[in-house]
Amino acid sequence: MKIGVYPGSFDPVTNGHLDIIERASKIFDKLIVAVLVNPNKTPVFDIDERVELLKETTEHLPNVEVKAFKGLLIDFMKQENAKVIVKGLRAVSDFEYEFQMALLNKKLEPSIETIFMMTNSKYSYLSSSMVKEVARFGGCIEDLVPEKIAKKVMKKLNKKYAEMEENK
């Protein structure tokens, strides 16, 4: 069985992430979306919320699993018996960092491969940070995040939106 792992913070998941997940799910028998617990970051959505948002977003993909992990990605890969890391690239600027990480992972575990997938060009500008910024100021994020989770993301990120929803 070919198992791939697509790791990330996904705070929150964007349409760019979903684009990579859907395309990578066609390559592997099983794709694990690995949600990182990063002690150096303070996410807006806690780990359980991020896992749940991703499960909702990917429920139409039967070979996709969503799991949280902390520590080294290589250790998670071994635990899951996976051999391929999937990394999404928006622009050339993403490549340098991701290339260094791929080399480090290869050094730590020579049997692990990394594949790079370019996101659809219509999402090349998109990041979770940008989604959070737009939502905080009440902007429309419906084209930025999966439709199923847009209201939840807005509710969490925009107090005004949350108050309007509660008063309905």
From Swiss-Prot:
One of the Pfam families matching this protein, by short name: CTP_transf_like
Task: Cite the binding residues for ATP.
Answer: 9-10, 17, 88-90, 98, 123-129
Enzyme Commission number: 2.7.7.3
GO function term, MF aspect, one: ATP binding
Q: Where in the cell is it found?
A: Cytoplasm
Annotated residues that bind substrate are located at 9, 41, 73, 87
Look up the record and name the pathway of this protein. Cofactor biosynthesis; coenzyme A biosynthesis; CoA from (R)-pantothenate: step 4/5
Give the reaction(s) catalysed: (R)-4'-phosphopantetheine + ATP + H(+) = 3'-dephospho-CoA + diphosphate
- In chain numbering, the residues marked as site (Transition state stabilizer) are 17
Which biological processes are named by the entry's GO terms?
Answer: coenzyme A biosynthetic process
One Gene Ontology cellular component annotation?
Answer: cytoplasm
- Keyword annotations: ATP-binding, Coenzyme A biosynthesis, Cytoplasm, Magnesium, Nucleotide-binding, Nucleotidyltransferase, Transferase
Main EC class the enzyme belongs to: transferase
Cofactors that this protein relies on: Mg(2+)
Similarity annotation? Belongs to the bacterial CoaD family.
Q: What does this protein do?
A: Reversibly transfers an adenylyl group from ATP to 4'-phosphopantetheine, yielding dephospho-CoA (dPCoA) and pyrophosphate.
Q: Subunit arrangement? A: Homohexamer.
NCBIfam families recorded for this chain? coaD_prev_kdtB (TIGR01510), cyt_tran_rel (TIGR00125)
Q: What is this protein called?
A: Phosphopantetheine adenylyltransferase
Q: Which organism is it from?
A: Caldicellulosiruptor saccharolyticus (strain ATCC 43494 / DSM 8903 / Tp8T 6331)
Gene symbol here is: coaD
